[in-house]
Regions:
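Anaerobic metallocofactor- and corrinoid-dependent redox/one-carbon enzyme cores
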Residues: 2-471
Length: 471
């Protein structure tokens, strides 16, 4: 087409980069498409140098990532019982409490985490009053470590102490285990920092009544295939992070036979059934350790750039990468953007909190929002947004989950295998849907919404990976 012909034709413009020109095009009613292009790695010269160095190892990285994906995807994980944490969680010592997210000292912890720790100290009987518990926590006598350092995960505050019951999940393919506490339900619960007597009594009931019954029941039915439940639930409107209605119902359907066969009083059996039945979030504490057990099978694969952990402690967000020697890469956690319960505002919320982003790391949760359109009523946005997030995550992932498919997207598999390189190059961050805790201990959940990891977590990991490359 000759350039003079342009003046007689209708203009159709593609705008690349700066969105400011788009406003002028709108005013002039010119048909246009905006391409949100940004330079690789945001134009950061040091990151581009790191990417150039990494590119020299491309074949080894591709092979390592393929192996990592294969190990995680082939992991068959079963719930095999409920036990006291001190009897099964590796290296969990007396006077030790585990928490969500990366390493942090007690003095720097967020309000909900401190509140939950005080509750755990009272539950363990290490102190008699809240004041004594707070002094003990500050004294240095108790050791605090991340759940992830002990093959465990915990929602929100993620507090795990020696006498707490945990679900025991076993990776039958690779022989590793993962652990998670029992979900207490909603309202005033330990994971949001509540530590009143009714909270502690519920925890005691879980230990004395619920745990032994469920342990026997699960053994009677030969364990529970958690992967199979997640696969079904995603096709029934769940994403198995913030929406677990179908998954919890499917789990109850699996275990009710074992419960009725168990040698416990009828009243105790009914209480256990009702506890699960009334708590639609029960399955979260199974989907999380399922993801942990399968992702741990993909740890420590040399040259792999795939993320094995995303976790938050209410102060910092931390990630781990398969080929980065179990190092934590941290940055200040973001605030969650979403919907608040009546009476609360953004000024009430703590920063992003919890180990539950392990679900997104495995390719469910926020990555599967397209399968759970009803969740937008809980976290905000539109159904179209949920579908788009599930599609967009393919741009930063190495592979897909053939087992977890999204019906509204013609059964498209969820994206899986967050690739450090793709995140830094594209400036696209993983999407996480999550609950919001009040910044003060004991108040509880104040809303839910969406959040991203800080970009800096990935840039730090990229530089570390590049600096430690060797043949």
């Amino acid at each position: 087409m000759a350039i003079n012909d342009l003046f007689g034709k209708e203009l159709k413009v593609i705008n690349i980069g700066s969105p400011s020109f788009v406003e002028d095009l709108k005013l002039q009613k010119v048909k246009h498409t905006h391409l949100d292009w940004r330079p690789p790695a945001g134009g950061d010269v040091s990151l581009i140098k790191a990417l150039n160095k990494i590119e020299l190892y491309r074949d080894k990285i591709n092979d390592a990532n393929e192996e990592m994906v294969k190990r995680v995807s082939s992991s068959e994980v079963k719930l095999i019982g409920l036990k006291l944490a001190k009897d099964v969680v590796p290296n969990l010592k007396e006077k030790m409490i585990l928490h969500a997210g990366p390493w942090i000292e007690y003095k720097n912890m967020a309000g909900p985490v401190k509140g939950a720790i005080i509750g755990a100290i009272l539950y363990e009987g290490w102190a008699k009053t809240h004041e004594e518990a707070a002094k003990l926590a500050e004294s240095g006598e108790i050791k605090f470590e991340p759940c992830h350092e002990h093959c465990a995960v915990g929602p929100m505050a993620g507090i795990l102490s020696p006498s707490m019951p945990v679900h025991v999940l076993y990776n039958e393919t690779y022989g590793n285990y993962a652990y998670c506490t029992v979900n207490e339900g909603l309202g005033k619960v330990l994971r949001f920092g509540a530590n009143s007597e009714d909270v502690l009594n519920r925890l005691r009931w879980i230990k004395t009544d619920f745990m032994p019954l469920m342990d026997e029941s699960i053994k009677l039915i030969g364990g529970v295939d958690v992967k199979n439940i997640i696969s079904q639930a995603i096709q029934m409107g769940d994403e198995c992070h913030n929406r677990n209605k179908a998954a919890t119902a499917l789990f109850l359907k699996e275990v009710v036979t074992g419960i009725t066969m168990s040698n416990f009083p009828l009243e105790q059996k009914l209480s256990a059934i009702q506890f699960i039945q009334k708590n639609e979030h029960y399955f979260l504490n199974l989907s999380m350790p399922f993801c942990k057990a399968s992702l741990d099978a993909g740890r420590n694969i040399k040259y792999s750039t795939i993320c094995t952990v995303m976790a938050r402690n209410g102060v910092e967000f931390g990630i781990q990468i398969s080929g980065c020697n179990n190092e934590w890469f941290t940055h200040q956690a973001n605030f969650v953007q979403g919907l608040f319960f009546p009476g609360f505002t953004e000024n009430d919320a703590a920063r992003d909190l919890g180990d539950s982003a392990i679900t997104e790391t495995r390719g469910i949760g926020g990555f599967a929002m397209g399968s759970a359109p009803a969740i937008v009523q809980f976290v905000g946005g539109k159904v179209e947004d949920a579908l788009n997030y599930s599609i967009q995550m393919n741009e930063i992932c190495e592979s897909t989950n053939q087992t977890f498919t999204i019906p509204p997207l013609d059964f498209r598999p969820t994206a899986f295998g967050i690739d450090l390189i793709k995140v830094v190059e594209s400036n696209i961050l993983p999407i996480i849907n999550t609950g919001m805790a009040h910044k003060d201990p004991g108040v509880g959940q104040v809303g839910a919404g969406l959040v991203n990891p800080p970009y800096e977590c990935f840039t730090k990991a990229l530089k570390y990976f590049a600096d430690h490359l060797e043949d």
